[in-house]
Each structure stands twice: as structure tokens, then as C-alpha cells.
Amino acid sequence: MKRCKSDELQQQQGEEDGAGMEDAACLLPGADLRHGEASSANSAGGPTSDAGAAVAPNPGPRSKPPDLKKIQQLSEGSMFGHGLKHLFHSRRRSREREHQASQEAQQQQQQQGLSDQDSPDEKERSPEMHRVSYAVSLHDLPARPTAFNRVLQQIRSRPSIKRGASLHSSGGSGGRRAKSSSLEPQRGSPHLLRKAPQDSSLAAILHQHQGRPRSSSTTDTALLLADGSSAYLLAEEAESIGDKGDKGDLVALSLPSGPGHGDSDGPISLDVPDGAPDPQRTKAAIEHLHQKILKITEQIKIEQEARDDNVAEYLKLANNADKQQVSRIKQVFEKKNQKSAQTIAQLHKKLEHYRRRLKEIEQNGPSRQPKDVLRDMQQGLKDVGANMRAGISGFGGGVVEGVKGSLSGLSQATHTAVVSKPREFASLIRNKFGSADNIAHLKDPMEDGPPEEAARALSGSATLVSSPKYGSDDECSSASASSAGAGSNSGAGPGGALGSPRSNTLYGAPGNLDTLLEELREIKEGQSHLEDSMEDLKTQLQRDYTYMTQCLQEERYRYERLEEQLNDLTELHQNEMTNLKQELASMEEKVAYQSYERARDIQEAVESCLTRVTKLELQQQQQQVVQLEGVENANARALLGKFINVILALMAVLLVFVSTIANFITPLMKTRLRITSTALLLLVLFLLWKHWASLTYLLEHVLLPS
């Protein structure tokens, strides 16, 4: 069977605290085997129960095909698991209401039991063993197996499971505990400190038949083996469901501990007793959650620092690498970044979950986990099997005649009562809420509603053996007391009966198998519809996932293209900025050089102007001095002036002559070659001038002899 969506959501919230999930799945075939052994022992032990009794009939209705029983057990077990998981979300009810309900049930039981107390058998009984039945007299009892009433009484007289108690045991040790004797106390269990209060009538019968050998009740023992196997099957299913349950859901299962707790009319309920939570436990839970929150916060900081380091390393490597290396580095960085982002998101989810749990604990206080609750239920169901074996084997002497008459009906009824309850749970949940998924949403309306209706709904859902068709808790309690009384008085009649027509139809109708098959077909149809809807949902989710993946890939491709364009544009801008900087530097150098040259030219022009002004001032001063000195001797000055002019003219002529000669000589002195040739020419002329006489003599006598 597939789990519903709410179960998966609850399992995801507590994934960090998950334990072994499939411990009890392997024990189901063993439960079927033990059930088969019990049925064979039942059929074999019938003739040996008493010499004067009739042989028990062949239990024909119990011989179902193994495949059908297996399918039925699997389907009912899964529905039982879903029902239990959603029934544990109830709120607290007051203890005064429980006490009042138990007192009303006791009063109704006493009023209904007054009709049978006048019989001779009832007068001989002790006050603790009075019977309560819907029958008018002892001879008008219906043909209901009396031992089954004792089973109902044992189940209804279970002790309350205390808050905080749990079974620290694995699935493997559960099989050994189921095989141990019912009278031997279980070792290592927290239930040793609280004794199971037995019913007063059952205690009297056990005390009366304590000395009887167990061989006289072989049929009862065989029947109880079958019933114990059914109870063990339910216990293992409950344990497996508890292991699979979400540990984050803090709920508690507590049975009423009122004055009528040990009586047979105390139905099992899911009420949590009112009272302040344990401060030490609350403080420890808050400290534990604070430590987890600090740890998750440190992990988030470490992941963020690692992501920042990756970003810095990527930027550092990307600046020093070429395009191919940048693409590879980018891919590696994106993978690391996505992984870091996923890790940080998961850590944030865990942090929010822990904060939400811390807020719930601070507001409502801590409560037990579903795993501990279901383990306590497992222990309770195992104790039920032990009490069934002890009870039926104990009153075998006075009751064995009535038991042998309905041997096959008892085995079928007990098996149906213990194993078929998950189907009744699921039917009740479906009739009240529409589906098991709506219980969490209807939790608040149940709180706001009348307390009698809430108590009736919870008691009808959580009573393990009673029928869900009772009108109220009082009727359920009266029916339970009636069945217990009929079981106590079964020595004089063929059997007892419950006061509910639903119970008679369920356990005595010949068309029970057809009804079960019809319900099984309905369950299969519902499962097929659920599978179809799940397949449609998966298909829709796959399409959405494909579409989102495609959109993400397109966006990623677009992002990569935009990033490449941005990188190209950034490189272009960087190149342009570099060129502009170079041009600005060259222009700055040019401007500085030009300004320096211009300033030097201006400075030279200013200096020349200052020199000319100075010369003019000197000339003016000289002229003034000459004018002052030549005032007395004007003629001398005139002659002197003329003489100076003549001298200047001669000097000018001389300078002209010198300049002319220099103009002739200057072309001969421009280069070194010309200077050398000019010097040689002058030397030759000097030699010729010096030896002119010899030269003339040579010319006259040698060259020109004629």
C-alpha cells in the first residue's frame, strides 16, 4: 500500500532524527504461522479438554485461503497504521470529565445488572464476581462465546500508559517477548513498576482455579495461542508504524486513570491529563534545541565563508586566465556555488524547523513522540495476549463446558476482533472526516465542539475491541460490562452476548467473508484511484519539472550570452580608457614642452628689451653730460665733432676694406680642407717670395736658355 502525502510530509520534517523503518515488516509471516499453529492446536486440543464434553466442531469459517488472509492483514494493517497516526493528534481533556463519565458508566452498569442478581448462581457468587448482562436471566443468554467476553474485559481493564514511558527494544526482541510466558514479568521494560490491575471477577476466578492443572484447559490454551498471535501481529504493526512515524510530531497516548480504571467499563481513550508539564524536561528539550540551532547556525556560517572563498578564488583565477580556462573555471565555480546554495538552503530549512519546534515547546510544553506511544501500545497488546492466556486457562473448570460449545466461533471472533479493528478505524475515520488526511485540519473544530461529542469520537476511535457503532461512552461501557458478566456466568449457559446488534452481525453472520471481500474490493478500488491520482500527479510534476528545467536552461543560456556580451563590452571600455590615458599623457607632455619654450622666448625678449632701454639711458646721459660740458667752448666742440666724424669715416673705410678682404678670405676658411689648402697656398707664396731670386735665375738660365 502506498502512503498518503501527509505521511510523506510528516516524515520529511523529522528526517534528521529517523531510525530503522522496516523492523516489523519481516515479522508478519511469523504471525500468520503462529496463527496457523494456534488454529491447529485448537482443533487438536478440543477433544482433550474434558471427558464428558462434546467434541468441538470443525472451525470451518476460519480456514480461509492464505493469500486472502495475507492480503486482508496487509490492507487492514496499513489502514490501522494510518488511523493510529492521525488519531494521535487529539487535544487534552479534563480529568473531571473522565471521572464523571466513568461514574455514570458504573451507575448504568449497576442498573443494568440488577436483573440477573436474583438467580441462584448469582447468590452463590462472591460480591466481586457479580455479572452484568442485557439478558433477563441465566437461561436466556444468547449464543455468544463467553471466553470472548473475558477477552473484551481484559482489553478494557488495561492500565493507563504513563506519559514519558517507552519501550527501548528492537523489532527482533519483540518476537522473544511474545513467546515468553504471560505470568513471567518482562525484564528490562519500564512497565515493571506498574502492575496491570485485573478485573475483580477475573481475579476471583484465577484464585479459585489456581490449583488446577493446565492440561484440563487445553482447548482454551489453543484458543489463546491464536488470539495471542493476532495481538502480536497488531503489536508488531504498531511498532513498525511507530518506527516509520515522524519523530517531530510530539503527541502522547494516555489512558484515563480515574476511580473506575480497573473496572471493565473503562474504555481506552486518547485523553492527555491536564497539568503543568515537567519543567526539567521542558528545560532539557529547550536546551537541546538551542544546541541544535547553534550547530546549524555555525554550519551556515561555515558554508557561507566557503562560498565567499570560492567566489574570491574564482575572481582571482578569472583575472589571470585566458578565455578557455575562464569557461572551465566558471563551470567548476557554478557547480560549487550550486552545491553550496543547496546546502545552505537545507540548513536554513532545518533551522526553521528547529525554531518552530522550540516555539511549540515554549508554548505547549514537550510531549511524547509517536514512536514511544506506539511502543507502549505494543506492550499493552502483548500484555492483552498474556492476560487472555492466563484468564481463559484459569477458569477452565467451570467454564470449559460453555467454551467447548462455541470453540470455533470464539477463535474466529477473537481473531476478527483483534485483526479487523484497523478496518473499523479506517471506516470510522472515513465516515467522520471524509479521509484520514483531514483529521489534522479538523483538530481545532474538535476542540471547540461540545466535550461530550469529542469524548465520544475519541473513545469510539481509540477503543481497540469495542464496536464503533455504540451511541455513547456509557453504552460502550455497559456493553463491555455485560460481556464481562456473561463470561463470568458461562458455566450454566452456552455463551454470552454483547448488547449491540452490530457486534452480533459482525461475529455471527454467515456472510462475513462476503462482507470482508466487498470491503477489500472497495479498498482495492480506492487504492487504484489513489494510484491513478498519484500517477497523474507524478506526470504533472514531471511535466512541470521538465518545463521549469527547460526554462532554467534557456535563462542560463541567455544569462551566459549576456555575461559574454558584458565581458566584451567591459574589455572594450577598458581598452578605450587605456588609450585615452595614453593620449592624455602625450598631450600633457606636449603642452608642458610648448609652455616651457614659450616662456623661454618671452624671457629672452624681455631681457633684450631691458638691454636696449639701458643703452638708451646711457646714451641720453652721455648726451646730457656733453651738452653740459660743451656749453662754454662751442667751437672746440664743433671741431672735435668734425674730427670725430672724420675718424669715424676713416674707420668705416678701413672696416670696409677689412670686410672686403674678409669676404675674400672667408670662403677659403669655411671647412678644414679649405683652410689646409689656403695655408699651403700661403706657404707656397711665402717660399716663392723668399726664393724669388733663385727662381728667376732658374727661369732665365735653365728653362729659357735662348
Curated annotation (Swiss-Prot):
The modification Phosphoserine is found at S6, S435, S461, S467, S500. The chain crosses the membrane at residues 646-666, 679-699. GO terms for biological process: amyloid precursor protein metabolic process. The keyword Transmembrane helix applies. Residues 488-498 have a biased composition (Gly residues). It is a multi-pass membrane protein. Keywords: Coiled coil, Endoplasmic reticulum, Membrane, Methylation, Phosphoprotein, Transmembrane, Transmembrane helix. Residues 1-221, 251-280, 440-459, 464-510 are annotated as: Disordered. Residues 102-112, 477-487 have a biased composition (Low complexity). The modification Omega-N-methylarginine is found at R163. It holds the Pfam family Tmemb_cc2. It is found in: Endoplasmic reticulum membrane. Its main location: endoplasmic reticulum. Residues 330-365, 511-630 form a coiled coil. Residues 83-94 have a biased composition (Basic residues). Belongs to the TEX28 family. This is Transmembrane and coiled-coil domains protein 2.
